[in-house]
């Protein structure tokens, strides 16, 4: 192993020994295979699948990714999922109607959440919600 790389197992262990959060998630980067038309044709089924992942606690977060500079959207997105392992995350990604139909291509990468903060504000009566 070169000095510039570490095994993923090493990174997981290092998170534990350094008292980091060490939460392993999987990021699905998804991007158009052939323009926007196939994406729009599959958007309803895709969103239903996303809702199912959310309802079952598989989805951590998801949403579209703006193009560089944030001026436009060309159909790219990111989905962060909870999965037992890489193979399970791949299976979740492959089942997305966007990917199964060929409207989008994707790749999955493991992500180790070590640092950061999150603030959640929920208004019970108003039904408002805020994430910061």
Predicted ranges, named:
Residues 1-132:
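Conserved, structured core segments of small domains
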């Amino acid at each position: 192993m070169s000095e510039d790389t570490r095994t993923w197992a090493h990174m997981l262990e290092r998170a534990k020994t350094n008292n980091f959060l060490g939460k392993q998630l999987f990021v699905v980067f998804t991007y158009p295979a052939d323009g926007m038309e196939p994406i729009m044709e599959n958007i309803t089924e895709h969103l239903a699948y996303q809702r199912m992942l959310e309802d079952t606690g598989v989805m951590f977060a998801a949403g579209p990714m703006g193009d560089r500079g944030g001026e436009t959207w060309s159909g790219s997105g990111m989905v962060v999922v909870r999965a037992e392992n890489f193979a399970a995350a791949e299976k979740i990604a492959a089942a997305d109607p966007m990917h199964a139909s060929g409207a989008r291509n994707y790749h999955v990468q493991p992500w180790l959440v070590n640092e950061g903060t999150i603030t959640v504000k929920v208004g019970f009566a108003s039904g408002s919600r805020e994430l910061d």
